[in-house]
A protein has these predicted regions:
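Catalytic-domain carbohydrate-binding cleft regions of carbohydrate-active enzymes
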Residues: 1-222
């Protein structure tokens, strides 16, 4: 049987890519009151470090290798110019009747030469290769998104592999523990060839169109 999502999902959603600080985000609460707009969901697009896509921008922390998960208390936001207290922000949003949804994309990102190296992202990429958490070419090498596409050079997680799901969502569980209400599953149209293989034995021929479903299904289960 079909299961309906919670009622708040059916209310008005608000989002803007330039809401990239706690100050700007909390400003929306006042604007909603001022204009009496009955939003139920606020989506943050530019909230993360733009590398791991699961850590608030500006957070300080001790990097973790081998796919180890993070906990709420692992992060220090006191010096962040972007999100000095995301826990407090989430509580304010909830008090205002807003549910927080965070933007996601299914990549182990290949950072550009003009970007500051994110060492946690490097560790995650190494772990994905070492434990075969990503999709592979038929010769066994990691598949990388081709040039000319979004996130070129990035590897993509293989959600048919239980270990991938365990590690990927283990990294994001602390966000739910903070009170985050959901995730916007952007992207996913990254399988650009038939010549790739998945953990479950399928190839790109079956999964070019099926991969976005695997991606959203994994998040729904999470």
């Amino acid at each position: 049987p079909a299961i309906l999502p919670p009622d708040w999902v059916f209310g008005p959603w608000i989002s803007a890519n330039h809401w990239n600080t706690q100050k700007e985000t909390e400003k929306q609460i006042e604007l909603l009151k001022k204009y009496q707009f009955p939003a139920t969901v606020l989506v943050l697009e530019a909230w993360s470090d733009e590398a791991t896509f699961y850590i608030f921008n500006g957070a300080k922390y001790k990097e973790k290798p081998n796919g180890a998960p993070f906990a709420v208390g692992d992060f220090d936001y006191s010096e962040s110019a972007y999100w000095p207290n995301p826990q407090e922000m989430i509580e304010k949003l909830h008090k205002a009747g807003l549910h927080l949804v965070l933007w996601q994309v299914p990549v182990y990102k290949q950072q550009g030469d003009d970007e500051i190296r994110n060492h946690q992202n490097d560790l995650d990429r190494e772990d994905a290769v070492k434990r075969s958490l990503c999709i592979h070419n038929l010769d066994g090498t990691p598949y990388k998104i081709p040039e000319g596409h979004w996130f070129p050079g990035s590897m993509i997680p293989d959600f048919t592999n239980p270990e991938t799901c365990k590690t990927w969502f283990g990294k994001r569980q602390y966000l739910l523990n903070m009170g985050v209400d959901g995730f916007k599953t952007d992207g996913g149209e990254f399988v650009c060839t038939d010549a790739v293989s998945f953990y479950d034995g399928s190839t790109g021929k079956e999964s070019r169109n099926y991969y976005p479903q695997q991606y959203t299904k994994a998040y729904t289960k999470f």
